[in-house]
Amino acid sequence: MIKAEHQPCRIDRYIDSEPALEAYAEALRGRRVNAVALDMEGDQGTVRYAYSISILQCFDGSETVIIDVLKMGNQPALRHFLTDPAVIKVMFSCANDIFMAQNMLGCTIAPVWDIAVGQKLLNLPTNISDYLNIDKKQKDKFQRANWLKRPIRPEFLDYAVNDVMQLFTIERDIATKLRAAGLFDIYQNESAQISEKDFVIDHFRHYKAKFPGYDRLRPPQQKAAAAVWVFRELIGKHFDCPVGYILSKQAMAACIRDPERTVSSLEQELNRGRSAKRRVEKGLVEKYYQEAFRISGNP
């Protein structure tokens, strides 16, 4: 069992429906709250094929809040909460959270003040663990944990809330130093640029950037590489399995050495170490490779 070395935190609200989130947003307006500390937990291809946002954890200066995004689903109130211009989101190293929001929810997170941006401007180490009462190794364990299981384990929720409760204090200290150095406007502008950046990706078209040595491949191998990349996505979706567990990049590179044998090479790699009962049938490999070849734009 993972245990953080800090005292358990109280959770004031656990929000798992759109009406509950709307009520919380109304409460923020009633209290004239203009900033919340915010963080996100989820899965990026370590538990399932599809990326998923599990929760948002918030602290508004008075209440600690868990928003169960996985249970609630992608609702208009959630997108409004994340983009409400009247509420600044104080975050740490928010680019990946914005990537997830844009790709999973279809919205960005704004406006943001990113503590990591401030640390870089002040030439300070870019980290948050030193400010929190938790060891970096423990923090890494929580971040690698399965946040998709329900109910969420109490120690996971405790970690999540503890992660945001101190962000206001940290940000105020950073902001004071930035103002003294005449860097506060740059801090705000660079934080805003992260929100405005387009992080949306098409996993099927990512082979040019991610397939090993793609630019150096001969044209026949580039065609095979594109198809193999899309094939891995299709097979991952079929089995609801993270693609990295299905075929490593090294294995994909090996499968295109002889484009004429790509299908048989894929079948061999997919079944490496599998029992007879768990073999991936050749017909399934051929079906998805043909579809991948078509999707990737190959003639």
What are these regions (language model features)?
Residues 42-43, 95:
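Short glycine-rich anion-binding loops that position phosphate/pyrophosphate groups of nucleotides
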Residues 38, 44-47:
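A structured, charge-rich N-terminal accessory region that forms the first stable segment of a protein
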Residues 33-34, 52-53, 86-87:
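Short, surface-exposed beta-edge/turn micro-motifs
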Residues 43, 117-121, 251-252:
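Conserved short loop/turn motifs at secondary-structure junctions
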Residues 4-6, 14, 57, 62-77, ...:
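Active-site-proximal helix-loop-helix substrate-binding element of RNase H-like nuclease domains
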Residues 145, 152-154, 164, 170-299:
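Accessory DNA-binding and partner-docking regions appended to nucleic-acid-acting proteins
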Residues 46-62:
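A short alpha/beta connector and helix-capping loop motif
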Residues 1-36, 40:
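N-terminal accessory regions of nucleic-acid-interacting proteins
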